[in-house]
Amino acid sequence: MYKKEVNRPFVVNPLTVSVNSTGKERLVLDLRHVNKFVEKQKVKFEGVKEAMTFVNFSGFGFKFDLKSGYHHIEIHPDHQKYLGFSWQYGDTVRYFTFSVLPFGLSSAGHIFTKTVRVLVKYWRSLGFPMVVYLDDGMGTAENFDTCFELSKTVKNDLLLSGFIANTEKECLGTSTKY
């Protein structure tokens, strides 16, 4: 997720921990000063409207969650110096930089969504009814066997694309009656 820096990075940002409603902790890089220089990009997330368009709720379905979704996207080495933070080890301060997309970068949602959308467009071109919101996705089919095969194809495509599914949440390779 990050790499050790020999020297102090160009920018050293505060590092915080965010806790969600289930108690899961997530490292968040406070990039408020860096974000001032990041071009603002609009991103349209899929939601209920798209789910109603693409998904068949009268058949079988599966879902997936990508483990640490943003951390699948590598940051170009020239840009990592802006994603630095420090860590105190006893009497020594050590510096690190994120080498993957961090939580806290204002363009992270746009970058991640645009990357995953390539897979979604591919699946839809094959006739797979899919909806993805950031790192969570679902698909459906009219019968169990088709849904099971679809979920295996999606799981394989995710792995071949370098994504890792969260095995604690995934239902890939399974089908559930809606």
Protein language model features and the residues they cover:
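Catalytic-core region of right-hand nucleic acid polymerases
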Residues: 1-113
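Active-site palm subdomain of RNA-directed nucleic acid polymerases
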Residues: 4-6, 109-158
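Short Gly/Ser/Thr- and Asp/Glu-enriched loop/turn motifs at secondary-structure junctions
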Residues: 8-12, 132-135, 168-175
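Catalytic palm active-site di-aspartate
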Residues: 30, 65-67, 102-104, 126-143, ...
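Juxtamembrane helix-loop transition sites at the ends of transmembrane segments
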Residues: 51, 86, 125, 156-157, ...
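A conserved non-catalytic segment of reverse transcriptases
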Residues: 94-99, 155-178
